[in-house]
Each structure stands twice: as structure tokens, then as C-alpha cells.
Amino acid sequence: MMSDEQANWPQEQCFASFKHCLPVCRESVYSQFFEAFREDIKVKRESAAVKNLKIIFDATFELASKGGFDAMSLRDLSQSTGISMGGLYNYISSKDMLAQMVNDFLSQRLAPLAYSLNLESGSPRQRLATRLRIYIYMGSLFRPWYRFVYMESKSMARQQRDQAKQFDLIDTAKLKELIEEGVAAGEMHCSNSELTASALLALIQDWYLKSWKYKQNETSTDDYANFLVSLMDKLLADNDQQTHDQTGYNDHSGKNNQ
């Protein structure tokens, strides 16, 4: 069990405290999904619907990772889940609908829940570091969802492809905005905020798109988040002055220094 101090996000910025404070987890995500699409799902008994939604999407993510979403048919999904075609139609009417549901759920439910844990005050550097950590922590918790959106968007309908691109543009713009705030405040030094934001986002996406590599290297979620924040400081620091943490916690350990 976590102590009150350990659960004190955002002062204690580690994966454990984030999970403790985030109002959704791997186990509850399908209850949230059912609530989001209650009007579209024909099965109205929540317990039965949540159980089958987990089966359907776990199988979808697995089939897509092995052979690609484009090659997957609803018949393949039926065989993998053991749910009849008629049963599947109680939850999804088509592959396009399935892909759209995943995109909408990420952008309209999961992302807002995560961003509610962003720092509302503090320096641009503190807010940027917190946002980077949130991206990494969410990528660890909901890796199959993020991987599906970014890896399979090329084989989706145009609407889903455009939506996936928009996710990327929005995230890049937010990182760029925080970098430019830091530069304006004299806290950061950056000659190209657009490229720096894009580079940071690419490292975030690498975390959940190539998880096998980090698992093989035994890199933990906190290891990667600490590395990314440390790299951010190096990229944005004045060459003549070493950037130091002003938040009261150590970015390299996730532990409070006070």
C-alpha cells in the first residue's frame, strides 16, 4: 500500500503515484469504454458488456499486432474471441466503427483524464516535465491502445487516419508551446522549438511502439521517464549553466528531496 506521501501527485512524480491518482486503470478501462459508447452498444447489461468488450479489444489488438488491422476481418475476430458474428454486431457494426471507437475513446476519455493531472501552476519547465511523464505513464498503462492508433492508422479509413495525424499535431503543439513559454521566461534555451518538440514526442512514441526493446533491456517506466526529463533538461539548458530541478523532487529517482 502506498503512503500518503507516495500518493501525492504531482509532488511525488513516479509511475506508482500517477497510477494511484489516475481515475482509470487497466481493469476499469472497459467500464469507462462502455459508459462512453452506451448508446451504440446494444447489450445493456454492463457486467456482460464489459466482459465481452475486454475480450473483443484484447483480441483486436493482438490480431492487429500480428498481421495488421487491414488484414483482420470480423470473421477473424469472431474466431479469436469465440463470440459469434451476431454477437460482435451487438458491439460493433464494422471494422471502421471499431477503429473510430478506439480513436474517440483515446481522445475524448483517456487523454482528458490523464491531462487532468497536469500541473496547473509552476514554471514552464516543471509543467513540461510533468507532461512528458504523463505521456510515458499513459503509454505504459494503455500501450495496446496507443500502439493500435499509431501503427494501424495507415490501414484505416481516411477519417481515422486524419484523426491519428491530428493527435500527433496537437501533442507537438502543446510541447512546443511549453518550450516557448520557458524560452520567454528565460528558463529554457532553444533555437527550434518545433523540432525539439517533435524530437521529444518521437521518443515518447518509441516507448510504446517498441516496448519489446525496453523490456529486453529491463528499462522500467520510471527509468524511461527519468531519462526523458533529463534529456529534456540537457536539450533546453543554457550551455553555460546547468539546469537544476526546482520542484522539490529528483527527476532521476522520482523521489522527494525535501
Regions of interest found by a model, annotated:
Residues 111, 159-185, 194-198, 209, ...:
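Amphipathic alpha-helical packing segments from all-alpha helical-bundle domains
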Residues 63-97:
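Helix-turn-helix
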Residues 116-144, 197-200, 225:
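Hydrophobic alpha-helical connector segments
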Residues 147-150, 191, 243-245:
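Short, hydrophobic secondary-structure boundary micro-motifs
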